Regions:
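Surface-exposed alpha-helical segments enriched in charged/polar residues
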Residues: 12, 39, 85-88, 114
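Acidic/histidine-rich catalytic cores of soluble enzymes
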Residues: 1-77
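A short, acidic, flexible beta-alpha connecting loop/helix-capping segment that sits on the rim
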Residues: 96-105
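Tryptophan-centric aromatic hotspots in well-structured domains and transmembrane helices
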Residues: 26, 93-95
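A short, acidic, amphipathic alpha-helical segment used as a generic capping/interface helix at domain edges
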Residues: 76-88
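C-terminal helical cap(s) of enzyme catalytic domains, especially alpha/beta-barrels
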Residues: 104-119
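Short helix-capping segments at alpha-helix termini
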Residues: 13-18, 89-91, 119
Length: 119
């Protein structure tokens, strides 16, 4: 018998009016597939946080992260194009570009936006 997680309880026990705010970085940090999760919550995601994670980090991550774990979109291991496609298909209204740690936040957001516009 497989035990349920807190996430499973939210998805199964709350009605469809319960919306989720999903962060693709932390989904990937748990070694899960963001696209599958987005598809599984189709119609129930109000906001999607787009972040990228440094290539070469062993997943899943337990405990602390190095400050350089957060990368500009397109510079890490998370393929954003299928995530954006899944988000559109799932009816996600708002996507937010984030980078928790950056030596130059303005340059980082600019680089991430250039990447997104190129998709």
């Amino acid at each position: 018998m497989q035990e349920s997680t807190g996430y499973d309880v939210f998805v199964q026990e709350f009605g469809d009016e319960m919306m989720f705010e999903v962060d693709v970085f932390w989904i990937k940090a748990a070694n899960l597939d963001p696209v599958s999760l987005i598809k599984g919550l189709s119609g129930r995601i109000s906001q999607l946080h787009l972040k990228d994670i440094k290539k070469g980090i062993n997943l899943p991550i337990y405990g602390g992260l190095p400050k350089d774990a957060f990368k500009e979109l397109g510079n890490g291991m998370i393929p954003m194009e299928p995530i954006i496609e899944a988000a559109k298909a799932a009816g996600v209204a708002h996507c937010h570009v984030e980078q928790d740690q950056s030596p130059d936040p303005i340059a980082s957001i600019k680089e991430s936006m250039v990447y997104l516009k190129g998709l």
